[in-house]
């Protein structure tokens, strides 16, 4: 009875992971050997605020869920923490910022963007891109610049007339 219950739990876990992996635009796999529970919880809290999932998953279950979700095949070994979400840039930034703080205990091992394997260097390059919010701010600044310059010009003209 106990084994049947455990098997059912694993089947449900794989089905749940599969449904989440299908929707994810990015999936990163990291080694977290030696990282304290407190620090892993801090990572989870940061991730949760950005809509990113963080979970330690048995490699065999993760492999099955990834395969069923259509991801390219990865050779999963040792202990892994899986991070996934819909924003590749935010996820990459989160992982590399955390890795800088904990370089001896947290290392990116593999990355998948849109279900295709990408190199660690590629993920690092993506982490250096501006976020969606930063890009929107830049665009807004470009759009408002002509009006800002026009108003500044009118103000300078008014000041020049007042001086004369």
Curated annotation (Swiss-Prot):
Keyword match Ribonucleoprotein: yes
What biological-process GO terms show up in the record?
A: translation
Organism superkingdom = Bacteria
Q: Where is the chain membrane-spanning?
A: none
In its UniProt record, a GO molecular function of this protein is:
large ribosomal subunit rRNA binding
The UniProt entry's coiled-coil ranges are none
Which GO cellular component terms are attached?
A: large ribosomal subunit
Q: Which UniProt keywords apply?
A: Ribonucleoprotein, Ribosomal protein, RNA-binding, rRNA-binding
Subunit organization: Part of the ribosomal stalk of the 50S ribosomal subunit. The N-terminus interacts with L11 and the large rRNA to form the base of the stalk. The C-terminus forms an elongated spine to which L12 dimers bind in a sequential fashion forming a multimeric L10(L12)X complex.
General function of this protein:
Forms part of the ribosomal stalk, playing a central role in the interaction of the ribosome with GTP-bound translation factors.
Hey, which family's this protein in?
A: Belongs to the universal ribosomal protein uL10 family.
Q: Which PANTHER family match?
A: 39S RIBOSOMAL PROTEIN L10, MITOCHONDRIAL
For this entry, the protein name equals Large ribosomal subunit protein uL10
Species annotation: Helicobacter pylori (strain G27)
């Amino acid at each position: 009875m106990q084994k049947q219950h455990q098997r059912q739990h694993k089947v449900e876990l794989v089905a749940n992971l599969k449904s989440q992996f299908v929707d994810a635009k990015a999936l990163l796999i990291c080694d977290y050997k030696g990282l304290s529970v407190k620090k892993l919880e801090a990572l989870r809290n940061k991730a949760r605020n950005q809509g990113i999932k963080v979970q330690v998953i048995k490699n065999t279950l993760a492999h099955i869920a990834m395969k069923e979700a259509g991801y390219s095949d990865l050779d999963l070994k040792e202990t892994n923490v899986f991070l996934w979400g819909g924003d590749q840039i935010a996820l990459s930034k989160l992982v590399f910022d955390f890795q800088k703080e904990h370089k001896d205990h947290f290392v990116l091992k593999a990355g998948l963007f849109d279900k295709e394997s990408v190199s660690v260097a590629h993920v690092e390059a993506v982490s250096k891109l501006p976020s969606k919010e930063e890009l929107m701010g830049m665009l807004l600044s470009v759009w408002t610049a002509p009006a800002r310059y026009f108003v500044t010009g009118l103000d300078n003209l008014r000041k020049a007339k007042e001086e004369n």
